Amino acid sequence: MNIKERMLLREKFYSPYATKDKESIRLIPIEEDIRPNFFRDIDRIIHSTSYTRYMDKTQVFSLKDNDNISKRMVHVQLVSKIARTIGRALSLNEDLIEAAALGHDLGHVPFGHEGERILNKISLKHNEGYFNHNVQSVRELMDIENDGEGINLSIQTLDAILCHNGELELKEYHPKKKTTDEFLQDYENCYKIEGYTKTLIPNTLEGCVVRISDIIAYLGRDIEDAERLNLIKKEDLPKEITDIIGSTNKEIVNTLIMDIINNSIDKPYLKMSDNVFEALKKLKKFNYENIYSKANTKEELTEYENMFESLF
């Protein structure tokens, strides 16, 4: 038994719905080494220049004089950890999960979703198509890295990155199998068709895990950041929500993880219970109304837009 075969022994204990290493597809075949395919994707991502640029990107709050506020790098690490916890409990491919989690926000821009909205507006004005950060993450990895040659990741990893959507929560996540050509068509359609990104479904169960973990990672953490900046108080959280999923980031993360695991074991899809899913939706709505809509002043947004416009 060679080293790679030893590393792949864990696949014997995989769920029948997990993605096996031999199922990895690349646009350009590569020479094998001791590392499993999706493990190599992790290495290629963390050694990319795009990954290095995570370092100073902000999450929700920008230009704040507080070192304890979450940055984009922290967020992707949290997504990776949460997703791997769920993946391990469900006996899925943790390498694919980690690769997708670490790469999912590579295309995010300064000033978070506000920056994304501004760039979308500018991009359309210049006839460059719709701008979505998940699509730009794939573009970084396929078309920009390595002097425009890309770093040749597995299609399953790229698809999970393309299909992540922290803005859209679902009670159930059913993977949608697709060919390489269908993935490439999805990628192209995101530039051409308004709202197309909202229709995307990951082609693996691992991709679905990363998608829901993105939401789990930011909900409670953003509340903590807002409390540090005195934007909200813990008592502001509605009791109808906290009674179900908790009031601290630790409680929220644990409740959501355990609910997904308990409702998804031995299933070909992910599922949340009715009451937890409703609480998640209400908490997300609370965050939008009390945190995200107040994270930037009108003056700051105007300044951001002027900066982007001058650089475009």
Predicted ranges, named:
Residues 46, 91, 107-110:
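Short coil/turn residues that cap or connect secondary-structure elements
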Residues 99-100:
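Active-site alpha-helix of zinc metalloproteases
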Residues 103-111, 217:
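Short active-site segment of divalent metal-dependent hydrolases/proteases
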Residues 112-125:
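A glycine- and small-aliphatic-rich helix-loop capping segment at beta-alpha/alpha-beta transitions
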